[in-house]
A protein has these predicted regions:
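Cysteine protease catalytic domains with a Cys-His-Asp triad
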Residues: 1-66
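Secondary-structure junction/capping motif
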Residues: 17-18, 103, 119
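Alpha-helix initiation/capping motif
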Residues: 18, 38-41, 81-85, 126
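Short, solvent-exposed coil/turn linker segments
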Residues: 35-42, 75, 115, 119
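Cysteine protease-like catalytic core of ubiquitin/ubiquitin-like
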Residues: 47-114
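Catalytic-core signature of thiol
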Residues: 95, 113-128
């Protein structure tokens, strides 16, 4: 008799993520993303929604993921939003190290927190 073994597929959380990686991880986590954009496109986003915004220089291949939920901005480095992003609230808590590579997953954690109306980031406030 043959025994069938089912293997659960996992999606590893990577530090450096692409927009495609973030969409896949969001789907697995049940996080709704209205759109992923680069900073130049962020000024034209509707006021309400769940967005991930890539901050990067014009001649750069790499950047830093941030997010916006309605009028609240999140940056895992605790930096206020660039002037093109109109938000009334933003975080000032730094969740990742200066050279950390997990800004994309942190953005998803923020959006999940807002969409489920639970402060899941609170556990990370004082880990020092």
């Amino acid at each position: 008799m043959r025994k069938i073994i089912r293997v659960k597929r996992t999606l590893p959380i990577k530090g450096i993520t692409s927009a495609g990686d973030l969409y896949k991880l969001a789907e697995r986590l049940g996080v709704h993303i209205d759109k992923i954009v680069v900073l130049d496109e962020a000024g034209s986003l509707p006021e309400k929604g769940s967005y991930i915004i890539l901050l990067k220089g014009p001649n750069s291949d790499v950047g830093h993921w941030t997010s916006r939920y309605n009028d609240e901005y999140f940056d895992s480095m605790g930096v206020r939003p660039p002037s093109i992003i109109k938000c009334r609230k933003w975080n000032d808590v730094q969740y990742q190290s200066t050279y950390g590579e997990y800004c994309g997953p942190w953005c998803l954690a923020f959006l999940l927190s807002k969409q489920q109306n639970k402060d899941i980031l609170k556990s990370f406030y004082d880990l020092d």
